[in-house]
Amino acid sequence: RDVRDHRHLLGLGRVLFDRVEWRAAARPSWIEGLWFGATPESEPTATAAPTGSIAFPAGGFYILRHEQDYLLLNCNPPGTNGVGTHKHNDLLSVELYIDGEDILVDPGCFLYTSDPQAYNRFRSTRAHSTVTVDQAEQNRLIPGKLFCLHPDSRVQVLQWESGGPVERLVAEHDGAARLELAPVL
């Protein structure tokens, strides 16, 4: 199985959360649900999951999709209650997948507390596929607090259109507002 294919989690979620619609999305990996009592006979028939563009505004993720190609735009706020808990400086970053190939990816982070400098590099604005202004972070890092960001920026989705002949997402954030005038990209 491709390491990027996480449909087996939908198979588990289908059983644990009784979400019939996840059964179709999990194919062919629904078999993971066997560990929690699902059987082929007990599984309801589900229609195929929608494959068009979709918005998850509560989580701040917007996906523009055409067939198997997609662009994911990250519009989620910096953390919980204004504290950037376990957050990266990735506002308005994009992930792009075309013709079976990852073009732009989120770098993630493979380490945490063993190397604080490396961890901060991986969660920096420059590590993500988004705009960096004057080499500044979208949200300032807080020294000594690896899992926190200063809540400097707010993100706002201005327009979301999908399902028609034109699909559009217009969003902005104010992470550079605290910087001096005449920024250099």
Name each model-derived stretch:
Residues 5-8, 127, 174:
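Positively charged, low-complexity intrinsically disordered regions
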Residues 54-71, 137, 141-185:
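Extended, loop-rich substrate-binding clefts of extracytoplasmic carbohydrate-active enzymes
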Residues 80-84, 116, 184:
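Low-complexity, polar-biased intrinsically disordered regions enriched in Pro/Ser/Thr/Gly
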Residues 1-104, 109, 156-160:
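Carbohydrate-active enzyme catalytic cores, enriched for enzymes
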Residues 90-150:
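Active-site rim segments in enzyme catalytic domains, especially the processed small/beta chain
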